[in-house]
């Protein structure tokens, strides 16, 4: 090999540096079409939260929030300016926007603001009963709000005192507070001098500092509990079953606007309670929206924030959009092609962000080919598409690409990563034969366009020989019930439940009970050796239970976030599989929709795609919900939902930013520039250089995206981020590294393929002019013609190079190493 080609002369670098420095992008004018009607109903200008009130016991109360929506969509809290009128003043009263009980019965509270009015029904029970303080319902929430359970929840506690992390063990916490060191932490004779109070109020030295005031409602509740003898709760005490935060969405102005929210818990006995003062509040973006201890939001700079409230085992949140006060904004007349654009635009209008325009035809074609098939269009395909005047040509091209085998290859690769299809060090952990059968089965299912929920159902319920029924390899590649439970939740729901194995999830709804209930579906999976050493028989053993770490009690199977099904005499996996594939499962459709969106848009609506949780909210919840509903409506037809996404204007926008969306990277106002994944990049290099690769177990010329085994790789693939499938993950490793840069510049892959393919020799044999050869190379690599400026710079190079083949070789090398080739844009 002539190694000079691996390092093009400095003149080439000087001439071409400006050409290849960035990614070429372009924009077309916005189409002036009428905007479709919004999918969601316009919100009421005047709203009162909550819409109904239920009060139980003498000390119960419910705060009201009154919200006005101005013409520009900004929300105002007008609670303090509103008038409250109780229909029957003997039943209830309102003080500073808080409804208080007086007598049993029912009445209404009329809320009036200017010419607006709304009536809130109120129901009161046991108004004369002073309910005793509950350890679980009143005291533990105080510990949680003050974050006692965070510091003292460490494995060894803190300063000699230990609580359960995030309150997963109420019984143990009560013991440690009241009886572990008798008389040390509580003083029943003089409750105010109890250590749990003096340390929290700053009256005694405390590593955690002062947590609340001595005369606060929290202190008074603790004193009442101690005065009653610090009792534990009865076994049948009501427990929280859900939590809501109101309002669920806010658009506020910056800086300094305030808005108070309210939080309400519902309990297993049917009651509800205002827990705003007991909830722990958090914000995802303090620079845009700060949150006070009792739910007071104060805006900062422009941006988005997700304000969360945690109470008991539940965490809920509200989306807060903050825009500059007095911002002048006019929404342009732009085309909305489907529900995707309508919902993207709704969010952008709230943010006062204008979407970028459409990309040009060359950019669209290249983007669609890479995303849908993992290939590049040929030069002839580019020229034909650009010359086509059919207004429906983009939609038709998408349909053609969806019917190509390469579309199946891409999704077989992604699902192989989710299912961790890989060989192990021995036959017990996945033989090559089993892995190949597993991959081929998966690819066959996708090629037949079998509904995704049915594929999931067949995998979860798989039994028999892993060689005769390849889906049974789902239980061969992973045998630990704990890992099976975690991997299933992550692969099919996009939920990471790992935290809940040892303690209640700090920032999501999942408890240790939820974790063990989900795990119980996998504790009765039996395995035995088949006749072939590589064969394993998967069956229902009928024995094996999931036990709670606290108390070692058996936890029956329970759907995540759902009911406890009847599994008596049934294969538990079949029960789970039926539920996963059913409309009652709220997770699968949204997760698959998010996977699709992330692949084609470069970022998930929930990002990372396999980390769905309250504290990592969707950037556009309405869009995610609509995509999930469409997927169910389409019977989990993968092609149909991909078609919806790719036909949207949102997918076809340019990557070029405007003044309003320059800093936005999560609301899809412009296309995302992203590097090709490792397998696709290698395949595209081979395609444009007309060379063939040989991968283990595949014929020469097979593409890297077709490799079945996660353990099969090359130096190039490993360097550019090919996954080994050791963990559940479909996120593509596309971050730059020094090894990648060095391999492209000095490695043998690009240089060797240029020499091996003979493209330059072929082009020069056709009596083409230098400009025609350069244009052909550009069409191959960038899928566009070179600009006049680029041609002038190239002429400066080949004009001073004695050997034209060497000049073309160097230009080809530079194109393949350019960002515009390596990135999809």
Task: Please describe what each predicted stretch is.
Residues 1-18:
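N-terminal secretory signal peptides that target proteins for export/translocation
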Residues 71-76, 267-273:
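Structural motif
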Residues 212-231, 738, 742-746, 750, ...:
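Catalytic cores of secreted or luminal carbohydrate-active enzymes
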Residues 332-406, 417-696, 727, 731, ...:
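Primarily short, surface-exposed interaction patches in extracytoplasmic proteins
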